[in-house]
Amino acid sequence: LDFTSGVAVNALGHCHPHLVAALQEQATRLWHMSNLFKSPDGDRLAARLCEQSFADFVFFCNSGAEAMECAIKVARRYHAAKGHPERYRLVTFEGAFHGRTLGTLAATGSAKYLEGFGPPLDGFDQVPHGDLEAVKKAIGPQTAAILIEPVQGEGGVRSAPTAFFKSLRQLCDDNGLLLIFDEVQTGMGRTGDLFAYKRLGVTPDIMSLAKALGGGFPIGACLATAEAASGMTPGSHGSTFGGNPLAIAAANAVLDVMLKPGFFDHVQKMSLLLKQKLASVVDRYPAVLSEVRGEGLLVGVKAVVPSGDLVNALRDEKLLTVGAGDNVVRFLAPLIVNEAEVEQSVQMLDEVTTRPLGRSRPRHSSAKACTLAGSL
């Protein structure tokens, strides 16, 4: 069972028939035309994303890092256009992950990702996650925006109280700042709604998407209100491959499936079942596991033993999971997972916790990885 989903990308499993059909059809029509020209399908995707969110404008790109770079540029350009180019700094949070470009690495602020790449780019002030007083102290005359993930994925599936996010919104309103949500991992249904901000009841000014947006085909998007995007003019940003017809076809197909009635109810139902079952395993093996955390099907199990050993042992049982910070193992099931697959995954976890960890069984080149859409 693949409970990595390509790190929260394959939200509809592997080779979902509707996505396959959409890509096959588009591949016979048009592959690439650059962003010099508009396309009806691209306009439709942008309109659908705006209709389902707070946004008025969408910029298409190819990845989460590119979507985040766009978000950073939009925030800085907004203040420059208002006559305040000195307002370019962003408040970010410890444990965050925003990408691997130089700009997003600086926003991430993690030493292990920055090692060997020289000094980080200027313009980011990192504070402890969930510390409102630290945020207030970090805001100054050069601050442009606050950037945060609704749930930290790479950082260990860590969230913060809803009141904290509401306070961030108020701080932005009081100080003329923009609020940016990095929903690259939390967006597109992963937390039980199309976007995590809806469950928080806190609306950002800018939001980045990627990962599950294309269901496995590379695409990213930066969404913004008309006010936040007011500094962006033709030529101020661009992407050769962003919004190419194949990626647009995949993303529209993903929305076709996700916007059907009952889809997110199913995600929430499977989330509750998975977390309840995982919690029972945690209760039985406190020397191995200590906590279940997360929202929707962005679920983490905090380990007492090294999380890497647990990931390896689960892989030997033919369950694919992925590690995260804070010694957490992420269970990122496809959003179409069923009850039997949830039960099977938890049974596999139960089995590995009963034996010594740290040594993987020999693996053979003929082994197949079982996925939610058959074997690879």
Can you name each region flagged by the protein language model?
Residues 1-376:
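Conserved N-terminal phosphate-binding loop of PLP-dependent enzymes in the Aspartate aminotransferase
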